[in-house]
């Protein structure tokens, strides 16, 4: 299992420095690999759903094979480093490239800051960068809702899930998860072009996020008072509303957040979670919950690690 020191350093590195430039960012490279295979197989797309599924499966397997091979080779090189401190730093840096702590906070906070400054049009434009819905006609409460929904969902996708797989499967685990998540983001759409071509990435993403999403939700419940929430209401949201979103995973963190802070999160025509007025203060509190979840995750894992190895 991964040392808690590496986990902590990874978080600190990402929190301070944020995302790497696109030219040297591993996730961008993974995206380029996905685009390469999609371009090769694009001409083979047809109205035959079975063919589309087969070609999508070939793309998925190819991408995962390349990512695993590359990271396995990198890990061999890292293991040849004699200095343990340098080895820890390199390992931590690489894992930090699979998470998006700083960027998640920045993108989620921007719409809130615009609303605070009463600049609704800029808030609509900034929230459009983090959600797939049309934001042109959203009012203030639905802009706040969209920001919080995105932030709570991405606690899992951007942070907890890659760390979870790094803990149990090392660098390969973190990067394979990131590859699956990136393929789902690029190919996992329910439209004519991607319905079957992106089917496998979507299924794998649901499977990969099943445990991490529930860990994130449980941490939001347990430590609700630290971000101004209510444990009892948070637990009620987890149990009764976590399953109400189209995604089998994203609803748990959103439902906990909504109920814990006594507010309503709504994607019109899809779901409505919680019951209460959504305010700017509650929105900022929801972003603080990201810090709470991350550091509670690290602390609890550190305790488990010490008990497992030393007792």
Swiss-Prot record:
Topological relation to the membrane, as annotated: Multi-pass membrane protein
Species the sequence originates in: Methanococcus aeolicus (strain ATCC BAA-1280 / DSM 17508 / OCM 812 / Nankai-3)
Transmembrane segments: 53-73, 76-96, 157-177, 288-308
This protein's record includes keyword Transmembrane: yes
Gene label: cobD
Summary of the function given for this chain in its UniProt record: Converts cobyric acid to cobinamide by the addition of aminopropanol on the F carboxylic group.
A matching Pfam family: CobD_Cbib
Keyword annotations: Cell membrane, Cobalamin biosynthesis, Membrane, Transmembrane, Transmembrane helix
InterPro entries reported for this sequence: Cobalamin_biosynth_CobD/CbiB
Localization of this protein: Cell membrane
GO annotation, cellular component aspect: plasma membrane
Protein name: Probable cobalamin biosynthesis protein CobD
GO biological process: cobalamin biosynthetic process
Assigned protein family: Belongs to the CobD/CbiB family.
Molecular-function GO terms, alphabetical: ABC-type vitamin B12 transporter activity; threonine-phosphate decarboxylase activity
Pathway membership: Cofactor biosynthesis; adenosylcobalamin biosynthesis
């Amino acid at each position: 299992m991964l040392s808690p020191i590496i986990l902590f350093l990874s978080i600190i590195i990402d929190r301070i420095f944020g995302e790497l430039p696109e030219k040297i960012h591993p996730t961008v490279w993974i995206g380029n690999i996905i685009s390469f295979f999609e371009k090769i197989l694009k001409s083979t797309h047809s109205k035959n759903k079975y063919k589309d599924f087969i070609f999508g499966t070939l793309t998925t397997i190819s991408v995962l094979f390349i990512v695993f091979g590359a990271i396995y080779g990198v890990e061999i090189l890292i293991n040849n480093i004699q200095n343990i401190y340098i080895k820890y730093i390199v390992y931590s840096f690489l894992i930090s490239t699979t998470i998006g702590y700083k960027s998640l906070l920045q993108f989620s906070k921007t719409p809130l800051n615009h609303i605070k400054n009463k600049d609704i049009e800029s808030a609509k434009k900034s929230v459009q960068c983090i959600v797939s819905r049309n934001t042109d006609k959203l009012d203030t409460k639905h802009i706040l809702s969209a920001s919080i929904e995105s932030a709570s969902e991405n606690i899992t996708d951007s942070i907890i899930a890659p760390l979870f797989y790094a803990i149990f499967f090392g660098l390969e685990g973190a990067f394979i998860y990131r590859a699956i998540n990136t393929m789902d983001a690029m190919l996992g759409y329910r439209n004519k072009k991607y319905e079957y071509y992106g089917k496998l990435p979507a299924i794998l993403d649901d499977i990969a996020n099943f445990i991490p999403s529930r860990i994130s939700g449980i941490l939001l419940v347990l430590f609700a008072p630290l971000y101004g929430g209510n444990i009892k209401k948070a637990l009620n949201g987890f149990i009764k509303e976590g399953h109400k979103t189209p995604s089998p995973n994203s609803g748990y963190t959103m439902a906990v957040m909504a109920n814990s802070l006594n507010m309503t999160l709504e994607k019109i025509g899809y779901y409505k979670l919680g019951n209460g007025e959504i305010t700017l203060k509650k929105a900022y509190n929801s972003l603080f919950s990201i810090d709470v979840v991350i550091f509670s995750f690290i602390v609890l894992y550190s305790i488990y690690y010490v008990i497992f190895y030393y007792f």
